[in-house]
Amino acid sequence: MAHDILIVDDEPDISGLVAGILEDEGYSARTARDADGALAEIAARRPNLIFLDIWLQGSRLDGLELLDIIKREHPEVPVVMISGHGNIETAVAAIKRGAYDFIEKPFNADRLVVITERALETLRLRREVRELKQLTQPHTMVGRSSVIQQLRATVDRVGPTNSRILIVGPSGSGKELTARMIHAASARAQGPFVVINAAAITPERLEYELFGVEEGEGRERHRGALEEAHGGTLFLDEIADMPRETQNRVLRVLVEQTFSRIGSSEKVRVDVRIISSTGRHLEEEIAAGRFREDLYHRLSVVPIRVPPLAERREDIPDLVDFFIDLISQTTGLQRRKVGEDAMAVLQSHDWPGNVRQLRNNVERLLILAGGDPDAEVTASMLPPDVGALVPTLPNGNGGEHLMGLPLREAREVFEREYLAAQINRFGGNISRTAEFVGMERSALHRKLKALGVG
């Protein structure tokens, strides 16, 4: 989408000229003649970049005073000062007060375009750095399973469409990551990605964070998530926890594309793509009267399901390797190699907390695993709640090694437990189980039937 640029100059010829040059380059331009007009434009919709005349003749505030207000309320917005001949010292002083750069009158169109491109690129890089500092997840789904390949293909198709998406999946499965992938695949990828988790915010606080608050007696203006996400994507996480009154206001935003801050009747227009998620069955919430059906249909133009980890067990080795690399880089913990027996147990676990639970267990394993740091992590070193899946010998000794051996090397007494665990590990896929244990598919079928393993 086109970047939104505000030009503030008391001379209409100058502001019109700047706006014309920028619009020819594909930008969206607005103008204001004085400080009050500029503040009104910024309040209505925060621009990506501001060109500001230093003097602003006839204005309540001059350019430097207005600059101070802009940098205090919107420190991330770059401001380029417009100066006349003889104002260079003042322009330099403006840079010391937070201006990004300055351009002299009469100015060269090429220089104007270059400064614009550079300022917007700086804005983009700062935003990326801020978002990367918050990220502790991969930028894409890790894994090669068919369900993940299908999910990636769906993201590639819906990302560029600008349609509203409803992501459905259990807690910890990667709903926010899927939303980030959709954002990255869209034309808004260089814009902000803002997250509001309805389950993590009290109902009283939710509207404050979502819509913001107008400046008034005893309170400062607060920009809400809708304004923060202008030009980008707003991710509404766990929308089933959103109060009905807030649902009503969100529906109006979707219908009218405008909203009002708390304490104000003034309409604010934003350009935001909304992606939402839930771990509940919204049809049941609608039937119980807890969620608006019309809002559901507005949000779920394209529904996407993120599978639980139990449906993609074959991705667990890739996920474990990824998390070991990530955790060792961010914490300084030594990398460890996970042995085949331990990996088999990890793949056999049901993981009710999904990918998030797996990550936490990998981190716990790196912290608590003793012994030679160069030695493989074995099943006996796994956390108790996961390692409890390892079968034991009748005499009470551990049988951890059995999970990593072909069937022909396992003792006959353990065939039933061994094969049941392996089938669970591979999600009921007989072909992959047969390949791992070293049997023909037909022979495995006969063995399972003889053992009574379903």
Swiss-Prot record:
Molecular function GO labels: ATP binding; ATP hydrolysis activity; sequence-specific DNA binding
Superkingdom assignment: Bacteria
Spans traversing the lipid bilayer: none
Family matches, as InterPro entries: AAA+_ATPase (IPR003593), CheY-like_superfamily (IPR011006), Homeodomain-like_sf (IPR009057), HTH_Fis (IPR002197), P-loop_NTPase (IPR027417), Sig_transdc_resp-reg_receiver (IPR001789), Sigma_54_int (IPR002078), Sigma_54_int_dom_ATP-bd_2 (IPR025943)
Record carries keyword Protein transport: no
Presence of keyword Kinase: no
DNA-binding region: 430-449
One of the GO BP terms on file: regulation of DNA-templated transcription
Residues recorded with modification 4-aspartylphosphate: 53
Domain Response regulatory: 4-120
Binding site for ATP: 169-176, 229-238
Alphabetical keyword list: Activator, ATP-binding, DNA-binding, Nitrogen fixation, Nucleotide-binding, Phosphoprotein, Repressor, Transcription, Transcription regulation, Two-component regulatory system
CDD domains, per database record: AAA, REC_NtrX-like
Sigma-54 factor interaction domain boundaries: 141-367
Biological function: Member of the two-component regulatory system NtrY/NtrX involved in the activation of nitrogen assimilatory genes such as GlnA. NtrX is probably phosphorylated by NtrY and interacts with sigma-54.
Record protein name field: Nitrogen assimilation regulatory protein NtrX
Name of the encoding gene: ntrX
